[in-house]
Amino acid sequence: MGLGKKLSVAVAASFMSLTISLPGVQAAENPQLKENLTNFVPKHSLVQSELPSVSDKAIKQYLKQNGKVFKGNPSERLKLIDQTTDDLGYKHFRYVPVVNGVPVKDSQVIIHVDKSNNVYAINGELNNDVSAKTANSKKLSANQALDHAYKAIGKSPEAVSNGTVANKNKAELKAAATKDGKYRLAYDVTIRYIEPEPANWEVTVDAETGKILKKQNKVEHAATTGTGTTLKGKTVSLNISSESGKYVLRDLSKPTGTQIITYDLQNREYNLPGTLVSSTTNQFTTSSQRAAVDAHYNLGKVYDYFYQKFNRNSYDNKGGKIVSSVHYGSRYNNAAWIGDQMIYGDGDGSFFSPLSGSMDVTAHEMTHGVTQETANLNYENQPGALNESFSDVFGYFNDTEDWDIGEDITVSQPALRSLSNPTKYGQPDNFKNYKNLPNTDAGDYGGVHTNSGIPNKAAYNTITKIGVNKAEQIYYRALTVYLTPSSTFKDAKAALIQSARDLYGSQDAASVEAAWNAVGL
């Protein structure tokens, strides 16, 4: 972020900047250290010992022992928010920095412990300077902050709706960074609704003055414009269920019990999720059902991909229902992940055909859900471009016939984007050509759909060097284990190198590093 201390501690020298190697610790390997890293902290500065137990308490005691390295006792400023064990047996503790009990917005610290109970890597944003820069006090209540947020987006609670579901609003007090590099107590307000149009607003409200520090509609989509063909007319097998004398697009076949459910909005932009798609027989063959068939079939395949490859149970890894709504709006040129489900427009026929007709677009949107529940990459600037890129990359992993994204739904051009040749569709493929676009809706929040071409090309370089099977494991591990909300391109490079080293060793880690070097990073 540049507003706090960017922290990266690891045995791997490839973790860029502020890198610390822990003595006596090995992950897959223990490479030679590079002494020219910026702000390098020598390994003898750390007290290293095997943790007596792998627990929050033991880790905080370890951090306390290393107080000089972290400029104080970081254990007093960290709150545990998640703990996972990966397939290698490594444990990962995800913390949020706090100030007087208030979490710091968009900051996380992840502490990684190997199978021998040694801390082998630490990365994230510690934000040592937050306390000194918090320059206000809390005067507003959460409800008052919600009122300010509604005014900022030009809506009222009465004017929006989630259909039959209660409004999904929340206001959480946090320490938020301002443009001048300081921090203020602010409410992180989330407002989600589906009527009169889908929205997933995040509004930052100053807790003292009510001033809007930031607002963003975080409805994430594959593209704002595009083209496509008509649905193919191909016959596919569907997992459905029989309910009340009819057949419906509800997939109950998954071994985990996760449901995949497909609805029809009948060209409305309200009453989400819509009407459950049904038939009097077990055949869904009418022209109005074709978009739903594609959405249902594709999502079943995408679920199977994440479950079979990574043992991931739905986007949230908790078996959450996977919901799609097709025929959203009239001639709507978009597909979107809106925080808890997907929507698909029918396209205008000249730029897009129905957007559910593309396997890689469906996988792209589902990956936004996975990202939301793991790294939660901010949807702006470099983190936002990474958010889009990881969705594109997993879109490719689900449809490896070509390097294009969206080729099955575009009408007036061959595809939306290309991993192998980003410049073909107006994206940069090297960091020297990074587009510094404004962080506004009109500027695509810093060019998240434009600058994603750079990490996309790095992914292409990686895949062509080490193959799909290794690359997809490396990318999934980086996304779910190492990345944090404010991760930059360099952080992604470091996370992918470390993931390659964890899984496959130094040779493949070097291939990943070379892939990113080739795009100017």
Curated annotation (Swiss-Prot):
The enzyme's E.C. designation: 3.4.24.28
Broad enzyme group: hydrolase
Binding site for Ca(2+) 1: Q283
Binding site for Ca(2+) 4: V411
Annotated Ca(2+) 3 binding sites: D399, D402, E407
Leader sequence residues: 1-27
Obligatory cofactor(s): Ca(2+); Zn(2+)
Catalytic residues as annotated in Swiss-Prot or TrEMBL: E365, H449
Localization in the cell: Secreted
UniProt entry keywords in alphabetical sequence: Calcium, Hydrolase, Metal-binding, Metalloprotease, Protease, Secreted, Signal, Zinc, Zymogen
Reaction(s) catalysed (UniProt annotation): Similar, but not identical, to that of thermolysin
Cofactor note: Binds 4 Ca(2+) ions per subunit. Binds 1 zinc ion per subunit.
Notes on temperature effects: Thermolabile.
The protein's name in its UniProt record: Bacillolysin
